[in-house]
Amino acid sequence: MAVLKAIKIEDRDGEILFRCPRCGMVFRSAKAYTRHVNKAHGHLFRK
């Protein structure tokens, strides 16, 4: 099974952001990142 691990980036305020390795979109929360991966890249995980 394929896994898309988020690239963690620290911004200038010290907040951790999540970047999608497949398309480069940036998210503030892990929940938003997970939702994006399931909706936009979910076809990679389904048969």
From Swiss-Prot:
Cofactor(s) in the UniProt record: Zn(2+)
Listed SUPFAM superfamilies: beta-beta-alpha zinc fingers
Cofactor note: Binds 1 zinc ion per subunit.
Keyword Protein transport: no
GO terms for MF: zinc ion binding
Superkingdom of this protein's organism: Archaea
Residues that hold Zn(2+) according to the record: 20, 23, 36, 41
Protein keywords: Metal-binding, Zinc, Zinc-finger
Protein name: Zinc-finger protein TK0143
Organism for this UniProt entry: Thermococcus kodakarensis (strain ATCC BAA-918 / JCM 12380 / KOD1)
